Amino acid sequence: MKSYLRLLWGIALLGCCACTTSQDRTTLLEVSPRSVVLPHEGGDEWIELQADGAWTSEVSPPIAREWLTTEPASGGAGKHRVRLHVAPNADFAQRDASVYFDAAELSQVVAVTQAPTLVTPGRLELPALNTTEYLTVGSASEPLEVTLSPQAEWCTAVVEGARMRIRVSTNLGAERSVTLHVTAGRFTQDVVLVQRAFDPARNYGDGEVVALQRATSGNGVCLVVVGDGYTLAEMARGTGKYETDMRRAAEAFFSVYPYSAYRSYFDVYMLTAISEEAGMSCVSPSETVDTKFSTLWQGVSTSISCDDGAVRDWLTRVT
């Protein structure tokens, strides 16, 4: 009889243990999304996790833990938001890793990809004068596409092999900026270009009138000295090429008789004129230069022509 009771008691205990084990078993582990792509500059992505038991996470391969972290790294039953954080990626190669979520015998994996750096630097400051600079282009598997936002006529961006040519025209106003949207397949990167403001304290602006001499005899005969084919880079006050050349031109004028004898009768003015490009156009050999007055040299002798109407209109700035 005692043996029979012991057998019944053992069966009851076994049933209780089996029941307890069944109730404690983890049967639910869900994560979403299963794959994420993060930008090269770094950032966060959130994973929605639901489990009915304790869970843990692990980043693989181990070297990826230098740039990828999870928070929290573990938890209990319930719904959780797990933050995936990636550090900036300065390399021209994409990063790939996996985050494994485990709960008892259940496992889920999230694939993590971080975009590569497409071009460097990510921000470029440019001078006020027209200039050309270059960005370094990475070895992306997809061809690069570039758009400007907002559209800016003063800026162009062209990919040339392993570099991107940036060209800006002269800025005579306030500081301005534009964003380059660079795309290579599914990866994107924004590059900010800032062109500095024109500094009137250090440079002459377009169409400024500067008195080089005042008449001390008579009513004053007006003489205006103006040049063509000078860019903003040559407009420094006092030391720039434009002012130096205009003063030399005035001195050359008064070095010839009879002007040398009557110099005191003249009011002499320098009128600034800023061109997009330096120099002048030429017929032979053929060369076109974008200048204020379209000055053209025939290529032989000293024959030079220009847009006379544009010059006359410009001279009206001197009153």
Regions found by a protein language model. Give the residues of each.
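Short, solvent-exposed loop/linker segments at the N-terminal edge
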Residues: 36-42, 125-130
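Zn2+-dependent metallopeptidase catalytic core
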Residues: 199-319
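Bacterial Sec-dependent N-terminal signal peptides
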Residues: 17-37, 104-109
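Short, surface-exposed loop/turn segments at beta-strand-coil junctions that are enriched for proline
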Residues: 87-93, 169-174
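Sec-dependent bacterial lipoprotein signal peptides
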Residues: 1-17
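A short beta-strand micro-motif common to beta-rich folds, especially ectodomain repeats
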Residues: 93-105, 174-185
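Interdomain boundary/hinge segments at the C-termini of tandem beta-sandwich modules
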Residues: 110-116, 191-197
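Surface-exposed binding patches on compact interaction domains or structured appendages
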Residues: 26-29, 52-83, 141-165
